[in-house]
């Protein structure tokens, strides 16, 4: 019996340590597949052996599920624990004190819980490795455009970025690029309203062609042009339904979906770009100042929670919390009280990439 227990402990260690050990590692998709495969085999062997050793069955399943899943959830929930350092740049003067005259940098807080997650700012080669062969779709309004810009800036050099920036910022248009070196395709889809995002996801479903990473968000246009939070809420619920029907394993369907551990299903990673902090007095038109008030912003936020589209309320999308990032960076990080300086979106992109790392290593 001692032998059985030791074997059980060994199996538990492998199951727990393989995914945890991968946490600091940058994996391309192929490597990810390899390690999910290795993990799957380990699990399968474990599952087949454990019936012969009933005393360790509970132990193995409890340890593996609790430790791995909890560790993953905790780290995902800590991803936005960042601090900013905003200082006057050399060109600063009281007459020249725009946001561009402040240097800003950010980093994850050094609390022990956050350090334990070993978040890291991915370098260009890390990010290229992670996204090698992927199809990334970023859809939404100007906030989404800044996310697309930040992601491309991480992957390409500044010479390439000059021309891309021009094309990407053509008003209200879509943009597509294939980064040949890493075979990554990125689509930016201009989709100012939630209904546009719903149309987009229905299109993926119709064509049975899904991106690997889907990043989307909307709200500002609706707030400005409709100023009706409950209508926004209705549109979010439609989007949620559409995304849920897209995903092979949805939170609601659970056991109806493919059985975990059977043929692996490829499921897109879906992110929500939250609205930024709005600084009413800095907004650049009368209509914006009138309609995009703090109260309206609060009502839109409540609808977002209520729609259950976000992971934190049981939905499928992981929030990139631009509000918290922009709030913490502060008034010196924006010129118009709505669009923030590039570092805010860079932070959001790094948070997204870290979430992808966590999810791809520890998905069982
Ligand atoms: C920023 O500049 C304005 C004038 O452009 C001035 O009134 C204000 O005091 C300056 N603020 C700081 C913090 O220097
Ligand atoms: C991307 O993957 C391909 C094939 O797996 C490989 O040949 C190439 O070197 C990779 N590129 C990068 C930048 O990792
Ligand atoms: C987005 O949706 C609105 C309202 O449903 C529609 O008028 C507009 O044409 C759509 N825009 C795009 C780019 O699909
Ligand atoms: C707001 O939207 C809801 C739902 O679409 C609609 O029933 C209501 O009449 C709208 N309110 C206003 C003031 O337009």
Each predicted region: which residue ranges?
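A compositional signature for long Ser/Thr(±Pro)-rich, low-complexity
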Residues: 1-364
């Amino acid at each position: 019996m001692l032998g059985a227990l030791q074997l059980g402990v060994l199996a538990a260690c492998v199951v727990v340590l393989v995914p945890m050990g991968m946490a600091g590692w940058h994996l391309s998709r192929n490597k990810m597949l390899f390690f999910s495969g290795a993990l799957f085999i380990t699990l399968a062997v474990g599952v087949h052996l454990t019936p012969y050793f009933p005393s360790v069955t509970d132990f193995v399943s409890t340890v593996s599920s609790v430790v791995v899943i909890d560790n993953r959830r905790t780290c995902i929930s800590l991803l936005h624990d960042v601090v900013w350092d905003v200082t006057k740049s050399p060109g600063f003067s009281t007459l020249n004190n725009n946001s561009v005259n402040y240097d800003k940098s950010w980093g994850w807080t050094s609390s022990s819980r956050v350090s334990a997650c070993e978040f890291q700012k991915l370098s260009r080669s890390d990010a290229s490795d992670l996204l090698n062969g992927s199809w990334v779709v970023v859809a939404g309004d100007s906030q989404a455009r800044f996310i697309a810009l930040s992601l491309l800036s991480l992957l390409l050099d500044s010479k390439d970025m000059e021309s891309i920036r021009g094309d990407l910022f053509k008003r209200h248009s879509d943009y597509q690029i294939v980064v040949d070196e890493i075979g990554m395709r990125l689509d930016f889809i201009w989709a100012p309203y939630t209904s546009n995002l719903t149309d987009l996801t229905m299109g993926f479903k119709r064509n049975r062609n899904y991106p690997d990473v889907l990043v989307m968000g909307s709200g500002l246009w609706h707030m400005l042009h409709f100023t009706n939070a409950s209508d926004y809420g209705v549109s979010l619920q439609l989007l949620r339904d559409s995304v849920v029907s897209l995903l092979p394993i949805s939170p609601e369907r659970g056991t109806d979906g493919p059985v975990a551990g059977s043929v692996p299903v490829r499921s897109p990673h879906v992110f929500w770009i939250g609205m930024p902090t709005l600084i009413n007095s800095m907004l650049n038109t009368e209509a914006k100042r009138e309609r995009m008030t703090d109260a309206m912003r609060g009502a839109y936020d409540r609808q977002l929670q209520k729609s259950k589209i976000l992971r934190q309320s049981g939905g499928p999308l992981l929030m990139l919390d631009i509000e918290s990032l922009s709030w913490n960076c502060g008034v010196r990080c924006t010129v118009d009280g709505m669009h923030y300086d590039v570092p805010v979106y860079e932070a959001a992109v790094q948070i997204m990439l870290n979430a992808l790392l966590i999810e791809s290593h520890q998905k069982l």
